[in-house]
Structure formats: C-alpha cells, structure tokens
Regions:
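Phosphate-ester processing/binding pockets and catalytic centers
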Residues: 1-167
Length: 167
C-alpha cells in the first residue's frame, strides 16, 4: 500500500482483519453501490479450459453478466467495465468489449452496449476498492473467518450475488 513511505494504492492483501472490518463498515454505511462476485472453483476446471487465461476471464465475465442481466440483478442497459490492466493482453485490447457486445447485445440479452477500459490499479480507485472486496471473499474462502462481514454486506443491500462457476 505504501511505496517509499508514501501512499501508493489500496491492496486487499495488505489489510488485516480489523482493517477489512473497518473498510466493510465504511461502505456498508454508504449503500451507494452493488457488489457482485464471480467465484471460480479451479479444482473443477479442466486444464484445457484453463490453458488460455484471457479466454477464461472473458468467458466468465460474459456468462456472469448474462446471468446478472437475465435474472434482473443488473439492468439491461449501457455498462462501463473498468478492469485492471493485468487482465489485458495487448493483442486483445478490444476483444472483450467486442465479445460482450456480440454475445450479449446483438443477441438481445442486453439492450445497451458494453464499454471496457483497462487501468493501472494504482491510478483507479474503483479497481483498488474492488481488489479489497475481492480479497475479503478470498480470505473468507481460505479461513472461514469473514462470514459476519459478508453478512453485513448482504444485510445492508450491498452484496447482491455470488456467481459460482462451474455451476
């Protein structure tokens, strides 16, 4: 979180439990956004499926967005996705945006368009916040110690859904 003694960026892995609890309590009071997780059980995936991480990432994003829209968790409208540039391969910079627009918009599942942008997480507070929330679920799956915190997010209407893959 700090570089040469100055604040650099939020990193969920640098938060201890009290910091994560304070983070959750802060956002639970705000209740001005919705949180959706995509949880993947890697042990149930075939090696051939996982051989291209960009393809897996794009596919999981597509099927989860499809699910969220079809089940009215998110509206069928324009969507702006801000992603960590670590999820981008130079040769496929616009592939995800084209893929989502083809699979979800042209087919009529989504009535708007998808716009995908990639950022250095150090320069994007939304990605940093998402990183902390992601680490909270990851920590819970590893330790089982964050059930109360996840319940707080649910009870305050922030945590809307955890999409699990494979189904």
């Amino acid at each position: 979180m700090f570089l040469n003694g100055t604040f650099h960026e939020l990193k969920g892995s640098a938060f201890d439990k009290p910091m994560k609890q304070e983070f959750i309590n802060f956002f639970a009071r705000k209740n001005n956004f919705s949180l959706f997780y995509i949880k993947v059980d890697n042990s149930r995936l075939k090696d051939t499926f996982c051989s291209n991480t960009s393809r897996v990432f794009n596919y999981l994003l597509k099927i989860s967005m499809d699910y969220f829209i079809r089940n009215n968790y998110i509206p069928s409208e324009n969507h702006i996705l801000q992603l960590d540039e670590r999820n981008e391969r130079t040769e496929s910079r616009f592939f995800l945006e084209d893929y989502l627009n083809t699979e979800l918009c042209i087919t009529g599942i989504n009535q708007g368009n998808f716009e995908v942008s990639y950022f250095d997480s150090a320069n994007n507070s939304n990605i940093q916040i998402a990183d902390v929330f992601s680490n909270i679920l990851y920590s819970h799956l590893k330790t089982g110690n964050y059930a109360d915190e996840l319940d707080t997010l649910r009870d305050n209407g922030i945590l809307k859904y955890i999409f699990e893959f494979p189904l």
